[in-house]
């Protein structure tokens, strides 16, 4: 096994971790719609239940895209849309008066912005990704 093959396998492992993270977050949205909608409503989100279902769809589709390497540009866009929206509306730490709650929201905001940076960097990775549905679809 050469270095390129090792790096391709490590990239696959990273895709499984990242894609799995977003998939689980999406499934969590569907599993806990009422609870999450209550929190979103407390943050002023209109139609909170529909917003939770919609963001769950973004997470599942984006996570699956990453995991499978199938149309990863579209998956990246979906995840960036989710992260931008939730960061500005839900984790808007600058509006929180309580210092402990503010720190918690700031941590989530920072994590989300870092994930956006990572996702944007993946747009430079050559396609099709190794060991992906995209690579299977392009084989002769």
Briefly describe each language-model feature range.
Residues 1-31, 42, 46-61, 67-140:
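Extended, low-polarity transmembrane helix blocks
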């Amino acid at each position: 096994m050469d270095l390129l093959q090792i790096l391709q396998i490590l990239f696959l492992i990273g895709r499984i971790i990242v894609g799995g993270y977003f998939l689980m977050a999406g499934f969590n949205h569907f599993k806990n719609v009422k609870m999450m909608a209550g929190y979103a409503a407390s943050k002023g989100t209109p139609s909170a239940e529909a917003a939770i279902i919609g963001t769950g769809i973004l997470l599942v589709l984006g996570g699956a895209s990453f995991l499978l390497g199938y149309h990863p540009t579209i998956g990246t866009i979906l995840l960036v849309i989710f992260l931008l929206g939730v960061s500005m509306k839900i984790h808007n730490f600058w509006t929180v008066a309580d210092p402990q709650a503010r720190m918690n929201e700031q941590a989530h905001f920072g994590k989300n912005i870092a994930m956006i940076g990572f996702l944007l960097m993946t747009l430079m990775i050559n396609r099709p990704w190794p060991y992906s549905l995209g690579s299977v679809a392009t084989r002769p």
